[in-house]
UniProtKB/Swiss-Prot annotation:
Belongs to the peptidase A31 family. NCBIfam families: frhD, hydrog_prot. InterPro entries: Pept_A31_F420-red_hyd_d, Pept_HybD-like_dom_sf, Peptidase_A31. GO terms for biological process: protein modification process; protein processing. This is Putative hydrogenase maturation protease MJ0253. Keywords: Aspartyl protease, Hydrolase, Protease. Its EC number is 3.4.23.-. Transmembrane segments: none annotated. The keyword Acetylation does not apply. It is an enzyme of class 3 (hydrolase). GO terms for molecular function: aspartic-type endopeptidase activity; endopeptidase activity; enzyme activator activity. Signal peptide: none annotated.
Amino acid sequence: MKKKDILIVGCGNLLFGDDGFGCEVVSKLEKMNLPDNVEVIDAGASGAYYLMTLVDEDIKKIIVVDAIDFDLEPGTIKKIDVDELPNIKKYSFDAHNVPLAPFLKDLHNKGIEVVVIGCQGKEFTMPDIKPGLSEEVAKAVDKAIEIILGEIKK
């Protein structure tokens, strides 16, 4: 069996509107016939915890998929540089107050390629429960998958 050297991590919470974007993307990816070296994880709201426990010496590339608010049109997909993450509130701390940006930067500095695929959300409903993505964000799921498949081939 081929070692897993690419880790795709979907972050977010399906109960809070567009925050579930990363979960929706990895749900679709899990049903696809991906190369043997790719591992897909739905980290939910515990992205930092999963990343800290799942990254081992075999991992060469991490692709994080998440809904992020960076003041663009809802549904806009943006590939985010690791250096931009501390400027995004969600990446300063995750739902468990674990700083994710410094951890991703540290992985990057250790030679692991870190790619963050963000989607501009329209409705982040926390603390109010509202399952389901907005129409704009739902339409962006396939575009994100297309970008991720391109990243896998690099």
